[in-house]
């Protein structure tokens, strides 16, 4: 037995076994190191992916605002605004391609002081040379000052309209479009017929020219109307009123004897100032007549 033990101690098989055990232990240690390294790498990868996800989220947040700005710019660029001439050379009709006040609705802004109820009208009056603004169902009429140039006014009006419709703000605040032709309970039969004829036959035609006609009153055969938009200062407005509107009303409603144009206070002041300006120019010319020298005038 002791020999067997002694032999086993001396036997190379033990060394082999011991060597195998050492090798196994070494391999096991190596595997543990690999596993530890793998776990460390996995943890590092998770941290890297987590950091990357956070970075991507931050980048998305940072990019969101420029993308919204880009979308806004695309919206603005996608709007195609057309212009249309009117019988009045000082008025131009702008067609943004979207609804403005809706079918049959209009609103007149004869001056900047009347634009308190409309953010869009306020912005348009800031354009140099704009004298009056008028909103229709799907159009905007701009009336310029007499010495204004469309070449300078049009680009600014285009920019204002595009920016405003892209903003999504309401066109009117606490204001109703014209409802002058709305049938009221106390309207007599003649007034009802006048309003209906204005609303169905006359106003649509006038609105195509960038203006409108507002019913004021009817009394003793006289219909009083107010011209708006491009029609308010149009040189041919009187001809339109007499030859067009009056003739049509008299044809369908025999009770109508004549049609008269009504001017509000703003129109009266503007006309008064214009007449005074013309008078001062004439007086200046008469006070300083041209001097003739050698058959020529200076």
UniProtKB/Swiss-Prot annotation:
Residues 194-262 are annotated as: NifU. One of its GO terms (biological process) is iron-sulfur cluster assembly. It is found in: Mitochondrion. The keyword Transit peptide applies. SUPFAM superfamilies: Fe-S cluster assembly (FSCA) domain-like, Hypothetical protein SAV1430. GO terms for molecular function: iron ion binding; iron-sulfur cluster binding. The keyword Transit peptide applies. [4Fe-4S] cluster binds at residues 231, 234. Signal peptide: none annotated. InterPro entries: FSCA_dom_sf, Nfu/NifU_N, Nfu/NifU_N_sf, NIF_FeS_clus_asmbl_NifU_C. GO terms for cellular component: mitochondrion. SMART domains: Nfu_N. Molecular scaffold for [Fe-S] cluster assembly of mitochondrial iron-sulfur proteins. This is NFU1 iron-sulfur cluster scaffold homolog, mitochondrial. It comes from Drosophila grimshawi. The lineage of its organism: Eukaryota, Metazoa, Ecdysozoa, Arthropoda, Hexapoda.
